[in-house]
Amino acid sequence: MNIIMGILDQAVSAEEGYFAGGASRKSLMEEMRRIRSKYKATVFGDSGREGMKFKMALLFVLKRVKQKIILEDRLMEVIDSEVAYIIGCVKSITSEPIRVGTVEAVRPIQHEAEHKCAKPRTRANFPMDTSQLLRSWLKENMDNPYPSDAEKAYLCQKTGLGPAQINNWFINARRRILPFMKGKCSNFK
C-alpha cells in the first residue's frame, strides 16, 4: 500500500512541479516514464480491489495532466497567433510615412490605423449537433420544409438558437440543402 501511495504521490508531485513552472515538459515526461516503470514493476498485475482503486486514481491524475497540457498547447497557439497579428499591425503602422498636421488631421490617421489593424470578423458555424438536428428535421419533412410555430419552439429549445436564427437557417436550407437532399432521395428510388 505504501508503494502504491508513493507512486501516486510522485505523479501528483510531477504534475504540480510542471504546472507551477519549476519543471520543463521534458522533465515531466521523464518523471512519468519513471513512474510508469515503477508502476509496471510493482502494481501492474494487481487486479484486486486496492489495485483497481490505485489504477483509477492514477488514471484520474494522468487525464488531468493531459487535459492541462492540451489546454496549454492551445493557449500557446492563440498567443503566437495574437503576437504575429500585433507585429503585423505595428509593421503596417510604422511603414506608413509620418504626416505632420493639426490635431484634426491626426484623428483620421488614428482611425485609419485602427481600421487596418481591425481583425476581420469571421462568421461562426453552428455546432455539429445543432446542424445535425436541424438537417434531420429537414430530411424528415422534405415535402413540407416549413416548421410550425410549435416545431420552431421545440427546435429553439433543443438547439439553443433563437427563433430568428431558426427562421434564417430554414430559409437558407430550403435554398441550399433541400435541392441536394431531394436529388439524393430521387436517385435512390
Curated annotation (Swiss-Prot):
GO molecular function, one term: DNA binding
Subcellular location, principal: nucleus
A Gene Ontology cellular-component term: nucleus
Annotation: DNA-binding region: 119-181
Keyword set, alphabetical order: DNA-binding, Homeobox, Nucleus
CDD domains assigned to the protein according to its UniProt record, in alphabetical order: homeodomain
PROSITE patterns recorded: HOMEOBOX_2
Cleaved signal peptide residues: none
Subcellular location per the Swiss-Prot or TrEMBL entry: Nucleus
Keyword Nucleus part of the UniProt annotation: yes
A GO BP entry: regulation of DNA-templated transcription
Organism superkingdom: Eukaryota
Cited InterPro entries: HD, Homeodomain-like_sf, KN_HD, TALE_homeobox
Family according to the record: Belongs to the TALE/KNOX homeobox family.
Protein name: Homeobox protein HD-2
Organism: Encephalitozoon cuniculi (strain GB-M1)
